[in-house]
Curated annotation (Swiss-Prot):
<dbReference type="InterPro" id="IPR013750">
    <property type="entry name" value="GHMP_kinase_C_dom"/>
</dbReference>
<dbReference type="InterPro" id="IPR014721">
    <property type="entry name" value="Ribsml_uS5_D2-typ_fold_subgr"/>
</dbReference>
<dbReference type="GO" id="GO:0016114">
    <property type="term" value="P:terpenoid biosynthetic process"/>
</dbReference>
<feature type="binding site">
    <location>
        <begin position="95"/>
        <end position="105"/>
    </location>
    <ligand>
        <name>ATP</name>
    </ligand>
</feature>
<feature type="active site">
    <location>
        <position position="136"/>
    </location>
</feature>
<feature type="region of interest" description="Disordered">
    <location>
        <begin position="289"/>
        <end position="313"/>
    </location>
</feature>
<comment type="pathway">
    <text>Isoprenoid biosynthesis; isopentenyl diphosphate biosynthesis via DXP pathway; isopentenyl diphosphate from 1-deoxy-D-xylulose 5-phosphate: step 3/6.</text>
</comment>
<dbReference type="GO" id="GO:0019288">
    <property type="term" value="P:isopentenyl diphosphate biosynthetic process, methylerythritol 4-phosphate pathway"/>
</dbReference>
<dbReference type="Pfam" id="PF08544">
    <property type="entry name" value="GHMP_kinases_C"/>
</dbReference>
<keyword id="KW-0067">ATP-binding</keyword>
<dbReference type="GO" id="GO:0005524">
    <property type="term" value="F:ATP binding"/>
</dbReference>
<keyword id="KW-0414">Isoprene biosynthesis</keyword>
<dbReference type="InterPro" id="IPR006204">
    <property type="entry name" value="GHMP_kinase_N_dom"/>
</dbReference>
<dbReference type="InterPro" id="IPR036554">
    <property type="entry name" value="GHMP_kinase_C_sf"/>
</dbReference>
<protein>
    <recommendedName>
        <fullName>4-diphosphocytidyl-2-C-methyl-D-erythritol kinase</fullName>
        <ecNumber>2.7.1.148</ecNumber>
    </recommendedName>
</protein>
<dbReference type="GO" id="GO:0050515">
    <property type="term" value="F:4-(cytidine 5'-diphospho)-2-C-methyl-D-erythritol kinase activity"/>
</dbReference>
<dbReference type="InterPro" id="IPR004424">
    <property type="entry name" value="IspE"/>
</dbReference>
Amino acid sequence: MRLVTLAPAKVNLVLRVGPVRADGYHDLRTLMVPLDLGDRVDVRVSPRRGPVRCTVPGRPELDGPENLAARAAEAFRRRFGVDRAVSIRIEKRTPVTAGLGGGSSDAAAVLRCLARALRVRDGAALAALALEIGSDVPFFLGPGPAWAAGRGERLSRAEVPPLDLVLVYPADPSLAIRAGDAYRWLDEARASGSQAPRRLGRPGRWRPTLLGNDLQAPCVARKPALQALLGLLVGAGATAAIMSGSGPTVFGIFPGRGAARGAALAIQGRAKGGAAGVQVLLARTVRRHPRVSPWRSPRSASSRSTRRSSRPT
């Protein structure tokens, strides 16, 4: 069986971070929303026994067993006693290590595809498996926008209206941020007294005044160029702009699709004129994760389109 789905990127509209726990993780309260952009994940399950293979065309450094999607497939096979060969192909569109959840979303997409292909309906077991793979993975198994608590495993549905966004990802390797470093910088800032800890608060109805990210200040302190990117977004008309997750991607909220498109073009123009290498992405939040669908060849899709267009109107 061969299945395909979109592995959507996400942004954090709210990210509140509690003190470090005994297990080394932090308690979180975060509002995550999926976007209408992401990676295309193609999963083929063979009737025969065999290994897990994962390829990312054009990104050979992401091929192989260390890819989170491949690790998700291996974990699924162990948990549910499956030895059938699995082939994963990822068309990568979400920037890597960008604070947009690309790897976690790919992993969740693989779990969803395998669950459908192999008729696994134990949602609780899948959720537990997702948390073992990564803190953000359970969110991508859920129905859509959600408040997440704990490490990210306690999810509650959130109502978020469609938001038009412009994302700016700095391609400069010197601006890359590892998630572990972002949390460590926050702990150090709090220990020094330069950043006071916040109460995590309770999940509630989304409103723009909630927008915030506890990791932003310590990351900007070490990567001041991020502040310039936030300024680009506000200067282009964003009603608000923050960093997503552990960065380094920043995003702005715009009053409509047209305003967002114009801002994206303006920022791209600034980038060509000298603003350091950045990737500018236009996105909109969505209310549910994409469905898993059977794979169809481009030829069959084209023939269906031709049949539809030839019908009398």
